Amino acid sequence: MTEISSMVISHKKAKVEEMESAWHGDLDGLLRNLYKHEYVYECVVLKTCNRVEIYVVSPKSSSVLFSFAKEMGASTHIIDFYGHDESLEHLLRLAGGLESMIVGEDQILGQIKDLYAYSKKAGTTGKILETAFEKAIQVGKRIRNETRINKGSVSIGSAAVDLAEDIFGGLTGKNVLVIGAGEIGVLVAKALAEKDIEAIYIANRTYKKAEEIAYELGGHAVRLDDIRDYLPGADVVISGTGAPHYILTREIVEEAIKCRERKLLLIDIANPRDIEESVVELENVELCNIDNLRVISERTLRMRKEEAKKAEAIIQEEIRLLNLQYKRQKADRLISELYKQVYDVRLRERQKAVNRLSSYHTIGDIETEVLDDLTRSIVNKILGEPTKVLRQAAELGNEEFLDVVSRVFCLDKEKVRFEKIKQAKFDQIKPGCTKEQAEVKEEYAVKD
C-alpha cells in the first residue's frame, strides 16, 4: 500500500535564515514541481514563518523526498523525514498546537486549513492525504474544545508582545508601530489592544486594511511608505509582513534614532526577515527575532504541561481511529474493485443470454429486466459474505489476507489507478490560481 511520507523543516532544528532559504519559489511552483514527479501521487505543502513541511503519497517516498531536499539546498541535519505512522502523528500534533513554538497557539490550525485547501484546489490531493488532513483539522478543534492548551500567550503575535513587556518591564505609555496587517499582524495588534499603551500604529501595503484594523482596535492607520515619519516616535516596532525585501534597513533605522536618546525595540517576526540584522550595531537599538521567542515558548510550555498531556491522549485515541479508517478504506477499495470486476462479467454474460434468446424469439423489456435482476442478485448474494470477511480482516489489521485476496483477483493495481487519477487532475491544473488561492498565497507568501 502506498502511504504518506513527509519532510519537516521547523524552528526545532533550523534557524531563521535556514528556514528562509528552504524554498525560494511560490506555492504554485513548489506544488507543481512536486506533483509532476513520476512517483508523487498526492502532495500538500505547509509553509509558515516557523516551518516548511512537505507531505507526499508515493511508492518511492524516501528517494523522492531526499531529491527534493537536495533541490531545495536544505542541509539534512535540519530536516526530519517521517514515514506513514510518524507523519500522521506529527500532523495531528501540529494541528493540536503541540509542535508550535508557542505550544497550543491557535494560528497553526488556520494555516493548516488554508494551505490544505490551497493544495486541494490545485488538484494535488487525493483520498489518502484528504483523509489525514481532514482528521487533523477535526482533532485540532477537539483539543482546543476539550483542554485549556490554548489559554494564555497562544500565538507568535502575542508572544512578541509578551517579549516586549519583558524587555521594557511593561508597555504602559509606550508607542507601538505594527508593520503588516496579515494574520500575524492582526494577532499582534489585538494583543497590544489589551495593554495600557499610549498608541498603536498599524502600517500596511494595503492602506484600507490597515484602516479597518486600526478602526476596530482604536489605533492609527499608516501607509507603508510613511513609516519613516512614525519611527522616531515609536518605542516598539513589531514587523511581520510578506515582503521579499527588508522593510527596515539600517539606513532607515539610523535616520529615525538621530534625534532621540531613548531605547528602540525592534521585533522581527517575518520570514524572510523584515529588518536588516546590522541595526543591532546602532546605539539604543535592540533587535529580536523569532529565535528570541523561544524564551516565551519555554515559559508557556511549563504552564501548559498538564494540558499537553490531555492533548497527547486525544491524539493517540484519534490516531487509532485514523488507522482504522485507512484500513476500512483499503477494504472498501478492494471490495469496490471486486464488485466492478464481477459486474463487468455479469453485464457481458447477461448480454450474451439476451442475444441467444433473441435468436429464438423477440425479447421484451420485461424479460430483459428479469435477466438483469437475476444476474445482479446472484452477484450480490455471492459477494455478500466475502465483503463482510474483507472488512473484518481490514479492521483486524490482517494485511496479509487482504494482499492475498488482491493478488488472487488481480485487484488494487495501485500504480495504474493512481496514475490515471493523477493524469486526470494534472490535465485540469491551469496556470495561475483562483481568488481564494491568491489570498492564501499572499498570506503565506514564499519570496523570490
Swiss-Prot record:
Coiled-coil portions: none
GO molecular function, one term: glutamyl-tRNA reductase activity
BP term (GO), one: protoporphyrinogen IX biosynthetic process from glutamate
Pathway the protein acts in: Porphyrin-containing compound metabolism; protoporphyrin-IX biosynthesis; 5-aminolevulinate from L-glutamyl-tRNA(Glu): step 1/2
InterPro entries: 4pyrrol_synth_GluRdtase, 4pyrrol_synth_GluRdtase_dimer, 4pyrrol_synth_GluRdtase_N, GluRdtase_CS, GluRdtase_dimer_dom_sf, GluRdtase_N_sf, NAD(P)-bd_dom_sf, Shikm_DH/Glu-tRNA_Rdtase
UniProt-listed Enzyme Commission number(s): 1.2.1.70
Lineage: superkingdom: Archaea
Keywords associated with the record: NADP, Oxidoreductase, Porphyrin biosynthesis
Feature type site, description Important for activity: H90
CDD domains named in the record: NAD_bind_Glutamyl_tRNA_reduct
Ranges annotated as spanning the membrane: none
Positions annotated as active site in the UniProt record: C49
PROSITE patterns linked: GLUTR (PS00747)
Transmembrane helix as UniProt keyword: no
UniProt catalytic activity: (S)-4-amino-5-oxopentanoate + tRNA(Glu) + NADP(+) = L-glutamyl-tRNA(Glu) + NADPH + H(+)
Pfam families in UniProt: GlutR_dimer, GlutR_N, Shikimate_DH
Top-tier EC class: oxidoreductase
Self-association and partners: Homodimer.
Role according to the record: Catalyzes the NADPH-dependent reduction of glutamyl-tRNA(Glu) to glutamate 1-semialdehyde (GSA).
Family, similarity comment: Belongs to the glutamyl-tRNA reductase family.
Description of its domains: Possesses an unusual extended V-shaped dimeric structure with each monomer consisting of three distinct domains arranged along a curved 'spinal' alpha-helix. The N-terminal catalytic domain specifically recognizes the glutamate moiety of the substrate. The second domain is the NADPH-binding domain, and the third C-terminal domain is responsible for dimerization.
Other facts noted in the record for this chain: During catalysis, the active site Cys acts as a nucleophile attacking the alpha-carbonyl group of tRNA-bound glutamate with the formation of a thioester intermediate between enzyme and glutamate, and the concomitant release of tRNA(Glu). The thioester intermediate is finally reduced by direct hydride transfer from NADPH, to form the product GSA.
Name this polypeptide is given: Glutamyl-tRNA reductase
